[in-house]
């Protein structure tokens, strides 16, 4: 850490409904923009920059988002989270705020991100209090078939067929878990964890599983799409509002810096020469 600065870890929860995603964009309301503006106001700083574990898309929620920010070490930290929550819209809450351990990087130190996607196939749709975080599906879903299809996708693969490509960036990811189950209240939940996700990957995976769940495709189909390595027009990206980032996992503090170094080497595209 540069002399004169302190790195803070922020744990955040937000309703993604009113936001055009996490990342600051000109002319758009975003979670990053709201939190950075609140930090500048409360800490009386001309500029701040947040680094986040998971850049959620427009309409995606979070209950376990993690970010870091570097602030001058003379900024009073006592009551900072309370003061931030006092100026932030109620759609965003700072759940925790504390000095980060040495070597911590919210993005690159992370071991994994975990998302949950909620679906209801009840004939009456989503419960009124859950309509903003649960997809109402109009047809019955075969959850055992969806769960069987999910098993073929777990592991290290090139997920290019389920990602929007970014020039120079890898689409190889390690999918640690993709569990699909029906909870006692009837809601179908896809529980997804990976070392990292490329753009639209979780929602594309859910879209493929929905095609299996309603019987349009066999359980082996998502894996066949995966191995072909190109987008299939039959894979629809599931709507954003059913998706919530629930957890970001980190190694023990002494391993944070080493993890960040390894991840940077894999995730950052090389700078073009010439």
From Swiss-Prot:
Pfam families: PseudoU_synth_1 (PF01416). GO terms for molecular function: RNA binding; tRNA pseudouridine(38-40) synthase activity. InterPro entries: PsdUridine_synth_cat_dom_sf, PsdUridine_synth_TruA, PsdUridine_synth_TruA_a/b_dom, PsdUridine_synth_TruA_C, TruA/RsuA/RluB/E/F_N. It catalyses: uridine(38/39/40) in tRNA = pseudouridine(38/39/40) in tRNA. Substrate binds at residue 115. Keywords: Isomerase, tRNA processing. SUPFAM superfamilies: Pseudouridine synthase (SSF55120). Its EC number is 5.4.99.12. Belongs to the tRNA pseudouridine synthase TruA family. Formation of pseudouridine at positions 38, 39 and 40 in the anticodon stem and loop of transfer RNAs. Homodimer. HAMAP family: TruA. This is tRNA pseudouridine synthase A. It comes from Frankia casuarinae (strain DSM 45818 / CECT 9043 / HFP020203 / CcI3). The lineage of its organism: Bacteria, Bacillati, Actinomycetota, Actinomycetes, Frankiales. The gene is truA.
């Amino acid at each position: 850490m540069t002399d004169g600065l302190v790195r803070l870890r922020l744990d955040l929860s937000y309703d993604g409904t009113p936001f055009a995603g996490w990342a600051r964009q000109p002319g758009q309301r975003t979670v990053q923009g709201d939190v950075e503006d609140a930090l500048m106001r409360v800490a009386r700083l001309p500029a701040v920059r947040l680094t986040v574990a998971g850049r959620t898309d427009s309409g995606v929620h979070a209950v376990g988002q993690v970010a870091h920010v570097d602030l001058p070490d003379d900024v009073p930290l006592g009551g900072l989270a309370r003061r931030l929550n006092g100026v932030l819209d109620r759609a965003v809450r700072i759940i925790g705020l504390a000095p980060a351990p040495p070597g911590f990087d919210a993005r690159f130190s992370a071991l994994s991100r975990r998302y949950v996607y909620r679906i209801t196939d009840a004939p009456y749709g989503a419960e009124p209090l859950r309509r903003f975080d649960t997809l109402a599906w109009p047809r019955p879903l075969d959850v055992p078939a969806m769960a069987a299809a999910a098993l073929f996708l777990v592991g290290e693969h090139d997920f290019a067929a389920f990602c929007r490509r970014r020039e120079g960036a890898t689409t190889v990811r390690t999918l640690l878990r993709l569990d699909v189950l029906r909870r006692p209240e009837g809601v179908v939940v896809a529980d997804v964890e990976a070392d990292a996700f490329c753009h639209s990957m979780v929602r594309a995976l859910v879209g493929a599983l929905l095609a299996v769940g309603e019987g349009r495709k066999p359980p082996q189909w998502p894996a066949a799409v995966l191995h072909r390595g190109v987008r299939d027009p039959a894979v629809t990206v599931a709507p954003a509002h059913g998706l919530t980032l629930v957890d970001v996992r980190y190694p023990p503090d002494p391993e944070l810096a080493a993890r960040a170094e390894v991840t940077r080497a894999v995730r950052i595209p090389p700078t073009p020469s010439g």
